[in-house]
Structures are given as C-alpha cells and as structure tokens.
C-alpha cells in the first residue's frame, strides 16, 4: 500500500497542474521558476536540487522549515540555503493558486499580510499520507486513523489479529529504512513468535541537502519537557575536525542531548556526510551506550566521524580539568 502525496485543500489547487515528489522526475524541461509548497525534507531537497540545476526557486512553508529537526541546526541550514540564493518564505500559509502551467501565481498569507509569488511550475511537497483507500479496511474490521493502521507495538492490528502492518501504513513514520526494520520485526513476531516491538523513539532521519542535516531521538526542547533540569547539551563544531578542515567542508556541528548521568537522549548533526555520522549515534542509542562509552573506542584519524568521540570527550572536560581534578593531581604529586 505505502503512501501517497498529501494534497492540501488550497483554493484553486485541485484544478491547476502541479508536480509531486512522484511526478517531478517526469518534468520535460527545467522550470524557469519553481514554487515549492512545503519546507520539509522533500521540499528543501528538491528546492536545492533545482536551484543548483539553474532554476529560480521559492519555498513557501506555513510554519518553521524542518520543524521536526533540531531548531538550531534547522535555522542554520535555512540561512545557508538563503545565502545560496533560494528564497524561503517561512510562516506563510498558501491560500490560493491562480493561473496554469508556465504562468501561475500562489497567494500566501504571511506575518505582514498576503504576498503573491509568480512562477512557472508548482511542486506540492507538504508530506505524504498512508494509502489506505484501496485496502477496504472496514470489510476486515481493521481499525485505522489518519496515521495509518492502528497496531500493537509488534505491528499486529489491534482489531484484527490476522492483519499486520509494516512501512508507511503502520503509522510510525514514512522512511525506507523504517519499512525495512518493520519487516524484521514482522518476521520475528509473526513467523518466529519472538517478542518484538517496533518502537520509534530512536528513529534516525536525514534530510539529504548540502550540508546534510540528521536527527535521532529527542530534541533539546523535547528532552527538557520530559526530563526537566537533568538535561544537558554538548555541541562540537566541524571546524575543529582536521578531516573537515582538510576537505574544506567545515560547516556545521554535532549536537548531543544527554542527561547528567550520561544517558544519550538525542543527537543532531549538520554537516557534510551527516547521515554517516548519525549511524554511530543510532547504534549507541539502540544499545543504551552512555557518553562514557563513546570515549572508550578508538576513532581512525583523520575522519569526520571523529567528531562523535570529540564531543563525548568535551562533555567530561570540566571533570577532568576542573578545580577538583587539579587539586587531586596536586595531592598525588606530593605523595613520595
């Protein structure tokens, strides 16, 4: 079943030609001015791609772009894309579309009132929705909601034990890697009768722009709401990583959200090959490794992934080089 592009109820949109992430690769010619409706991962990926191919691009987002990402990194990325020449109108709600192919106007309501954006093509990229219409769930008495089929933690339907849901229709996210993981959960639970849970509190997500931005676990705000003052953050910049300096790709940083006991609650990375670096944090969180554990492995030099160990080491610097540590060293040095 999978998912299909979500089409918003903007006045005039249904009767006008537009592209989605499924059809845009059928575009016969490079658009002169592409209007992108939606500032999420798909919208920003396509916006940057078409801008670099030579199109003028305007992104219209009703809220904050990449609102599910770390807000610090998301804001930095938006700033970089604007510096590149991409127009990004955040907090602008699309209210009407006029005209047609090669001559269209999108009207959006912004903080300072309505604005008109004129373009040649429109890409609708406000998200995707589970494709449930053809499944006839009512006939099978399968409960569902706007996110997909309602399941137990092992992906089995809560209302029909003969039905299992994996991938985009399982209501836990829409990622290729998540669907693959769901398949392994299904095999364990349905075929091997092993206890399995498709928890998604450690779901890694990467937006493949340049530089990449990736997120896993809780953001700082989410962590503080859940754990209060026991939350700390550690940030380490790429401009202090020798491989990044050598490659002249120093933009961005790694941000870790942790508890004072060293438990890793979340991580965000902005930088070249950020998705590769997020792999380490995904493995660490899945196996409940702590910040101390991240200081114990040997990282090859020079690599960009060294930033993980450097960030973990930075967390312990106040304890290692603080007043108490210096006092202890002084005492030990006086011992004959």
Model-predicted regions and their roles:
Residues 2-3, 110, 123, 127-128:
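Short glycine-/small-residue-rich Rossmann-like dinucleotide-binding loops
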Residues 191, 196, 208-219, 224-336:
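Flexible, glycine-rich terminal cap/loop adjacent to redox cofactors
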Residues 1, 20-22, 90-92, 98, ...:
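Short loop/edge segments at beta-strand edges and connector loops
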Residues 4-5, 13, 147-161, 220, ...:
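FAD-binding beta-loop-beta segment adjacent to the flavin cofactor pocket
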Residues 14-31, 116-194, 295:
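FAD-site-proximal beta/loop scaffold in flavoenzymes
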Residues 2-56, 60, 84-87, 138-159:
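Glycine-rich dinucleotide-binding loop and its adjacent helix/turn
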Residues 25-26, 31-35, 41-113, 173-180, ...:
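Rossmann-like dinucleotide-binding cores of NAD(P)H-dependent redox enzymes
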């Amino acid at each position: 079943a999978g998912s299909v592009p979500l089409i918003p109820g903007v006045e005039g949109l249904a009767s006008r030609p537009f592209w989605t992430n499924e059809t845009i690769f059928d575009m016969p010619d490079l658009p002169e001015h592409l209007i992108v409706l939606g500032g999420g991962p798909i919208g920003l990926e396509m916006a940057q791609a078409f801008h670099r191919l030579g199109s003028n691009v305007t992104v219209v987002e009703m809220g904050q772009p990449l609102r599910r990402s770390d807000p610090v990194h998301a804001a930095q990325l938006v700033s970089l894309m604007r510096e590149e020449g991409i127009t990004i109108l955040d907090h602008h709600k699309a209210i009407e579309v006029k005209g047609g192919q090669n001559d269209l106007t999108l009207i959006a309501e912004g903080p300072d009132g309505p604005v008109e954006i004129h373009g040649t093509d429109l890409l609708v990229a406000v998200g995707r929705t589970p494709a449930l219409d053809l499944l006839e769930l009512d006939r099978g008495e399968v409960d569902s909601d706007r996110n997909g089929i309602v399941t137990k933690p092992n992906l089995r339907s809560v209302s029909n034990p003969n039905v299992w849901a994996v991938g985009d229709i399982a209501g836990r996210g829409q990622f290729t890697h998540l669907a693959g993981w769901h398949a392994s959960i299904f095999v364990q639970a349905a075929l091997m009768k092993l206890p399995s849970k498709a928890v998604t509190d450690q779901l890694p997500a990467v937006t493949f722009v340049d530089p990449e931005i990736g997120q896993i676990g809780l953001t700082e705000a989410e962590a503080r709401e859940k754990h209060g003052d026991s939350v700390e953050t550690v940030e380490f910049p790429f401009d202090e990583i020798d491989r990044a300096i050598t490659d002249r790709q120093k933009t961005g940083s790694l941000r870790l959200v942790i508890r004072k006991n060293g438990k890793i609650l979340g991580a965000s990375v902005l930088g070249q090959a950020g998705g590769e670096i997020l792999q380490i944090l995904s493995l660490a969180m899945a196996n409940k490794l702590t910040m101390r554990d991240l200081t114990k492995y040997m990282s090859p030099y020079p690599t960009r992934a060294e930033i993980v160990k450097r960030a973990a080491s930075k967390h312990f610097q106040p304890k290692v080089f603080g007043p108490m540590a210096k006092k202890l060293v002084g005492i030990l040095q006086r011992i004959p």
